[in-house]
């Protein structure tokens, strides 16, 4: 079963060509997951009050079409079967019934006081569960050792990047990645 929310795309989530950025898409799917957590429990705020935080480990996003300012969209999210300390979650974004984007993610649940990871089996929740997505790009890949890497820039994490958990919100990574 999937949790779905309806949105109108904000103009501030678009670029110079009026196309929604990767970060914009990430914001809608994150908000949808936040709504699911609030509706089914435990909520993001409840986790925060318990000294727990979900931290992203891996994210794969496939974008099949463009979104523009003021488009009416539906974002869906669902938890997937998870084991160990890896919490799996998937997302989709549709406009007029057409799939525009999909994402698959792996999260860790952290005890913020001790820094210890919390096992799936030690985290009771009511989040709806459905089948995982099969994306055209796996969230598990390694760069070959012979690929040359070079520093292309540096970025300081600023106040507006940081969320309630005291770390850079995962939706900011899209802007950083696309900015270089």
Segments (PLM) and residue ranges:
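Hydrophobic beta-sheet segments that form the core/acyl-binding groove
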Residues: 59-96
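Short coil/turn motifs at secondary-structure junctions
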Residues: 12, 82-83, 94-98, 108-112
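"Short basic amphipathic alpha-helical interaction patches in structured regions
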Residues: 89-95, 106, 119-123
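Hot-dog-fold acyl-thioester-processing enzymes
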Residues: 1-56, 102-104, 111-180
């Amino acid at each position: 079963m999937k949790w779905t929310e309806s949105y109108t795309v904000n103009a501030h989530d678009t670029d110079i060509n009026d196309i929604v950025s990767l970060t914009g898409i990430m914001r809608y799917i994150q908000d949808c997951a936040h709504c699911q957590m609030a509706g089914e429990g435990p909520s993001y705020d409840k986790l925060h009050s318990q000294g727990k935080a979900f931290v992203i480990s891996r994210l794969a996003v496939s974008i099949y079409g463009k979104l523009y300012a003021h488009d009416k969209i539906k974002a869906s999210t669902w938890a997937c079967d998870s084991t160990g300390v890896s919490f799996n979650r998937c997302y989709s974004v549709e406009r007029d019934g057409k799939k525009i984007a999909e994402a698959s993610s792996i999260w860790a649940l952290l005890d913020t006081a001790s820094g210890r990871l919390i096992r799936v089996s030690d985290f009771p929740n009511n989040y709806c569960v459905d089948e995982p997505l099969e994306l055209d790009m796996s969230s598990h890949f390694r760069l070959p050792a012979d690929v040359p890497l070079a520093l292309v820039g540096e970025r300081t994490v600023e106040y507006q990047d940081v969320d309630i958990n005291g770390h850079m919100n995962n939706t900011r990574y899209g802007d950083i990645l696309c900015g270089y």
